[in-house]
From Swiss-Prot:
The chain crosses the membrane at residues 608-628. It comes from Rattus norvegicus (Rat). PROSITE patterns: CADHERIN_1 (PS00232), CADHERIN_2 (PS50268). Residues 629-785 are cytoplasmic. Its main location: membrane. This is Cadherin-7. SUPFAM superfamilies: Cadherin-like (SSF49313). Pfam families: CADH_Y-type_LIR (PF01049), Cadherin (PF00028). It comes from the Eukaryota. It is a single-pass type I membrane protein. Cadherins are calcium-dependent cell adhesion proteins. They preferentially interact with themselves in a homophilic manner in connecting cells; cadherins may thus contribute to the sorting of heterogeneous cell types.
Length: 785
């Protein structure tokens, strides 16, 4: 029987598989390392995984993979049909497993501080079917700690302060170090503290890290700052432990343990007697080694002959004692003062009072220097009174001043005219007597405040000032008058006895007992039939009607003179006029219409007169307007004055060329005399090499030729002209042609014999052109013969 190719291949595969299983059963499984491993128990009723924790040391530095442990399943008979796989944290990257034996190795260096344990999953599979023969099981590989981290001070370097003079054991600051090693395993993380630098001044608690003072009475003024070095060591400080250090800067803070002291036992200062009050005479300062509030001073004068003359106060910024003047100094009265000054701390510390008194005293002597002082008045203000009726030259009062210096120089007086501009007063230069220089009026100025100057005769620059207040006493020199300009109305239907106005009076005088006015009608009006007056005895009076039946048509205005007398001595009086207008009133007595003529008649003009004046003014304005209009329309005469000679006038033509529109219609032939031939300008400074011929006339020549020839002539003139600018410039030319039949009158060639123009028509233009006709007429030959 022959086998096909397919059957032959299957047969060979079966033989190869049989040989492989036979070899595996005969071969021995590789023995594991001597390190213990954990596997499932042989006796079980149900297949399962049971694992303990695996441990591996951190920081393994060997060249070979580190053996961790062994996985084993009770299904594995050692025949090679079971393979092990590993999954989870670090599988394949950190941890590898021998799929035949289940041995686990670590291929990388592990650090417990980075990761303390790894969670993995184990799986046993059938090698042929790749199916699990055991349920997946989870286990942990824990990293075993070694002492590979030194203690670290996370908050360093430290700064702290402690009061000076503190007792031993005063807490300064606490330092703390941390160790990243496992605190639950061994002594790798157990730290103790010690001081490497800073002894014998400070100490540190080994377990807590609290720094304390180790010496008493440390003085800030001797040394105010200390640098400490603190060490933290693990393994409880044993040999082989790791350590770390930090620095601590300790500053001694100030306490008030130093009293103030004056550098000198006495001081001397000089000051002129002219110093004003509150001026600074001297500054003294007591030294204090303390700082801040502990160095703040208080100064006071405890003794001496200048207690009321001087005072001392502290300067908060500099802690100096400032001595100032309270009263004016006088060299002639006292030449020197002695002061006993005490300086003390503002806040004393009771703990240090035993060190001595916290105050000190010194002596200050102040020498007063003599200066040339201005004269001094005996009084700062001289009040005086004078009646306004006083005659010129009357003595008002006297001022007195003296020279305070020892020389006692004579004094001369004068009035500061800036305070007496109207020169109402005079003063005697030697005696100081003040007199009136003008008549006084209390109503104009009731009080005069003047300044009197006193100067030394020997030194006029020394001037003293005295102040005089002169009150003007009142006399009754002003008559009473109406309090206002009264004007009232009376109704046509007013009844007798009706009050139509209440009046009052004023008086510029000011009597000592007050004003009292008396009102009455003048003698000639006392018995008038229209109005009456009632004095109210309170400086007012009432005006009443005496009758009824007032009519505007009969009389529209009444004038009532009123006599007013004051109570002065002697009394004065005046007559004031009250204007009463008659008005048409309603039933309630309210005026409706008053005669308008009453407002015009006092001015002396009637309504008709005002209308006539207004009409005249308007007529005058119209005439002025017509004259101005006619003058503006007036034209200049076309014919000159016959007596004026035409040759005495110069006519200027300043017309400039037109714009683009005018230029387009420009006729060159009409703008110049084509019969005139101009000579070419030649240079006068050199001999010409070419003689220019006379130019032909441009009559009957096309315009473009005229333009070309004209520009060519101007170009030649510019080339030979020595005064032409040496650079290109814009040249402007204007033609004054022969637009008139008479051609150009300004051309000198027009009177030559070559001209064939007939000027006989000039004789027909009148006497103004007579002279011109003689020059250009038929008789011109005789004119030039």
């Amino acid at each position: 029987m022959k086998l096909g190719k397919v059957e032959l291949c299957r047969f060979l595969q079966l033989i190869a598989l049989f040989l492989c299983f036979s070899g595996m059963n005969q071969a021995e499984l590789p023995r594991s390392r001597s390190k213990p491993y954990f596997q499932l128990g042989r006796s079980r009723t149900k297949r399962s995984w049971v694992w303990n924790q695996f441990f591996v040391l951190e920081e393994y530095m060997g060249s070979d993979p580190l053996y961790v442990g062994k996985l084993h399943s009770d299904v594995d008979k050692g025949d090679g049909f079971i393979k092990y796989i590993l999954s989870g944290e670090g599988a394949s990257s950190i941890f590898i497993i021998d799929e035949n034996t289940g041995d686990i190795h670590a291929t990388k260096r592990l650090d417990r501080e980075e990761q303390a344990y790894y969670t993995l999953r184990a799986q046993a599979l059938d090698r042929l079917t790749n199916k699990p023969v055991e349920p997946e099981s989870e286990f942990v590989i824990k990293i075993q700690d070694i002492n590979d981290n030194e203690p670290k001070f996370l908050d360093g370097p430290y700064t702290a302060g402690v009061p000076e003079m503190s007792p031993v054991g005063t807490s300064v600051v606490q330092v703390t170090a941390t160790d990243a090693d496992d605190p639950t395993y061994g002594n790798s993380a157990r730290v103790v503290y010690s001081i490497l630098q800073g002894q014998p001044y400070f100490s540190v608690e080994p377990k807590t890290g609290v720094i304390k003072t180790a010496l008493p009475n440390m003085d800030r003024e001797a040394k105010d700052q200390y640098l400490l070095v603190i060490q933290a060591k693990d393994m409880v400080g044993q040999n082989g432990g790791l350590s770390g250090t930090t620095s601590v800067t300790v500053t001694l803070t100030d306490v008030n343990d130093n009293p103030p002291r004056f550098p000198r036992r006495s001081y001397q200062y000089n000051g002129p007697e002219s110093l004003p009050v509150a001026s600074v005479v001297a500054r003294i300062k007591a030294a204090d080694a303390d700082i801040g509030v502990n160095a703040e001073m208080e100064y006071k004068i405890v003794d001496g002959d200048g207690l009321g003359i001087f005072k001392i106060s502290p300067d908060k910024d500099t802690q100096e004692g400032i001595i100032t003047i309270q009263k004016e100094l006088d060299f002639e009265a006292k030449t020197s003062y002695t002061l006993r000054i005490e300086a003390a701390n503002r806040d004393a510390d009771p703990r240090f009072l035993s060190l001595g008194p916290f105050s000190d005293t010194t002596t200050v002597k102040i020498i007063v220097e003599d200066v040339d002082e201005p004269p001094v008045f005996s009084s700062p203000l001289y009040p005086m009174e004078v009646s306004e009726a006083t005659q010129v030259g009357h003595i008002i009062g006297t001022v007195a001043a003296h020279d305070p210096d020892s020389s006692n120089s004579p004094v001369r007086y004068s009035i500061d005219r800036n305070t007496d501009l109207e020169r109402y007063f005079n003063i005697d230069a030697n005696s100081g007597i003040i007199t009136t220089a003008k008549s006084l009026d209390r109503e104009t100025n009731p009080v005069h405040n003047i300044t009197v100057l006193a100067m030394e005769s020997q030194n006029p620059s020394q001037v003293g000032r005295g102040y005089v207040a002169i009150t003007i006493l009142d006399i009754n020199d002003n008559a009473p008058e109406f309090a206002m300009d009264y004007e009232t109305t009376v109704c046509e239907n007013a009844q007798p006895g009706q009050v139509i106005q209440k009046i009052s009076a004023i008086d510029k005088d000011e009597p000592s007992n007050g004003h009292q006015f008396y009102f009455s009608l003048t003698t000639d009006m006392a018995n008038n039939l229209n109005s009456s007056l009632k004095d109210n005895k309170d400086n007012t009076a009432s005006i009443l009607t005496r009758r009824n039946g007032f009519r505007r048509q009969e009389q529209s205005v009444y004038y009532l003179p009123i006599f007013i007398v004051d109570n002065g001595s002697p009394s004065l009086s005046s007559t004031n006029t009250l204007t009463i207008r008659v008005c048409d009133c309603d039933a309630d007595g309210i005026a409706q219409t008053c005669n308008a003529e009453a407002y015009i008649l006092p001015a002396g003009l009637s309504t008709g007169a005002l209308i006539a004046i207004l009409a005249c003014v308007l007529t005058l304005l119209v005439l002025i307007l017509l004259i101005v209009t006619m003058k503006r329309r007036k034209k200049e005469p076309l014919i000159f004055d016959e007596e004026r000679d035409i040759r005495e006038n110069i006519v200027r033509y300043d017309d400039e060329g037109g714009g683009e529109e005018d230029t387009e219609a420009f006729d060159m032939a009409a703008l110049r005399n084509l019969n005139v031939v101009r000579d070419t300008k030649t240079r006068r400074d050199v001999t010409p090499e070419i003689q220019f011929l006379s130019r032909p006339t441009f009559k009957n020549i096309p315009d473009n030729v005229i333009f070309r020839e004209f520009i060519w002539e101007r170009l030649k003139e510019a080339d030979v002209d020595p005064g032409a600018p040496p650079y290109d410039s814009l040249q402007t030319y204007a033609f004054e042609g022969n637009g008139s039949v008479a051609e150009s009158l300004g051309s000198l060639d027009s009177n030559s014999s070559n001209s064939d123009q007939n000027y006989d028509y000039l004789s027909d233009w009148g006497p103004r052109f007579k002279r011109l006709a003689e020059m250009y007429g038929n008789g011109q030959e005789s004119l030039y013969s």
